[in-house]
A protein has these predicted regions:
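Hydrophobic faces of well-ordered beta-strands that scaffold small-molecule active sites
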Residues: 125-129, 162-165, 185-188, 234-236, ...
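Gly/Pro-rich turn-and-neighbor structural signature
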Residues: 36, 109, 168-169, 174-175, ...
Length: 438
């Protein structure tokens, strides 16, 4: 028997998890965008707890109800957004690509409709909202939080579960909103533990650990205390203020041995601080720029339980980034004998004071991105992907592309591109538009 979702549809949820409640309100909004007033009965959407794998869901029709089964918060959130996309036709980047909605009386569903999700190819999947110059002073509907809410919603619709919610001050302001929507929090590699930056708190002091160790300790403990009730993957590390090698701020460290020794010592200390408060905490550290070189050369030792995050060069190639005139282009993926958990920090947007594309598309072809990410997966780097999404709007195509990679482990480039264009721009000029992306 055929059913329909319309303005009379009710969403029934007997629990009160905040991320699920927010997703329910968003789907109600989607129904209002898609459906006009109607006197016809709409099927109810019912959320039921069921023993399933983490983040997974199943949708079935049952007696004029559309039932979502899941065992956890994100399972229900993903299930709700699946209905929004698959039945209502609301796309992941509906806000960012100005999707046009033509209202109808209802969205019809076969009585045989069923869908079962499958595990993602990558465990932790998310975005770093970085150099967000087009977002952080923008108001939508007179609400300063609304652009950020739209970022986090798009990420969830793409199957994300992790976010660095902004740069510097913004990361502190918006992490509670991100958590309320169901996302785990992690941190920029220049802001270990999500703590306030030393130069921000003490602008009159030289940011030297040797001179002010207690001040650094206090900042790290403050970061832990402010986030210990959230679901966090704690980033450990030690970079200079403003995202540079720490020895730029403290020139007494002139050898690789001394630099690696200090970084390893402080990473261990930060881990101990977190462990004292949260015994089952998860950790990560970025092997980025100078850090990767120290690690590769054996000068930096890391705890076994820390996810090692490898990085591209800022423009999609998995080699070390340039810093000034230093550009070694060392391959940035783990060797076969490098055990433990691994992740990547990958850029669809990059701003390094020498070159930038944070307000334009990535100046590379989809096949390069596909090739590099396939290489990442072939090296079994599947524990953690954080994608620098910057302002989101200029980068939606690649964000959608990578979402397919972290879900399925692969993507058909041409099929995805044509589907993306047809979904957002219509069927009339697919060939011409596709050339702009290739």
């Amino acid at each position: 028997m055929e059913m329909q979702i319309n303005v009379n549809t009710k969403i029934i949820y007997m629990d009160s998890a905040v991320p699920v409640m927010r997703a329910i309100e968003n789907v109600k909004r989607d129904i209002r965008k898609v459906c006009c007033d109607s006197d016809e009965k709409g099927c109810d959407i019912v959320l039921i707890m069921e023993n399933m794998q983490a983040e997974q869901f199943e949708i079935k029709c049952d007696n004029n109800m559309l039932v979502i089964y899941a065992s956890d918060t994100l399972g229900f959130v993903y299930g709700l957004y699946h209905i929004s996309r698959d039945i209502l036709g609301v796309l992941p980047f509906w806000f960012w690509n100005d999707q046009v909605f033509i209202k109808k009386k209802g969205c019809r569903i076969s009585g045989e409709y069923a869908y079962t999700s499958k595990p993602y190819a990558v465990k932790y999947r998310g975005w770093f909202v970085n150099d967000e110059v087009l977002i952080h002073k923008w108001y939508v509907d007179r609400k300063k939080d609304m652009p950020w809410e739209m970022v986090f919603e798009a990420l969830l619709r793409c199957g994300g579960n992790l976010v660095i919610p902004g740069t510097d001050k913004n990361s502190h302001i918006y992490r509670d909103l991100a958590a309320d929507m169901g996302l785990r929090i992690t941190h920029h590699h220049a802001e270990p533990l999500g703590a306030p930056m030393f130069a921000r708190r003490y602008p009159e002091l030289t940011p030297s650990y040797d001179e002010y160790p207690e001040k650094f300790h206090e900042l790290w403990k403050e970061g832990i205390d402010e986030q210990k009730k959230l679901d966090v993957i704690w980033n450990l590390g030690f970079r200079g203020q403003g995202d540079c090698p720490f020895w730029d701020n403290d020139p007494r460290y002139q050898t690789s041995e001394s630099r690696g020794e200090l970084m390893g010592k402080l990473i261990g200390l930060q881990r101990d601080y977190v462990q004292n408060e949260i015994p089952d905490a998860q950790y990560c550290t970025n092997l980025y720029g100078e850090t990767m070189e120290l690690y590769r050369d054996g000068y930096l030792k890391l705890p076994d339980d820390v996810i090692k995050i490898w990085a591209d060069n800022g423009f999609g190639k998995m080699v070390t980034r340039r810093q000034g005139n230093h550009n070694p282009r060392i391959p940035a993926l783990p060797k076969e004998n490098n055990t433990g958990r691994h992740g990547i920090y990958y850029h669809v947007s990059f701003y390094d004071l020498q070159a930038a594309n944070h307000i334009t598309m990535l100046p590379n072809k989809p096949k390069l991105v596909h090739s590099e990410l396939k290489k990442v997966l072939e090296h079994h780097v599947k524990d953690y992907w954080i994608i620098n999404c910057s302002n989101v709007k200029p980068h939606v195509y690649y964000l959608d592309f990578i979402a397919n990679m972290w879900r399925d482990g692969d993507v058909d480039i041409d099929k995805h591109l044509k589907g993306y264009i047809a979904s957002y721009y219509g069927e009339d000029h697919i060939t011409e538009i596709a050339e702009c992306f290739r």
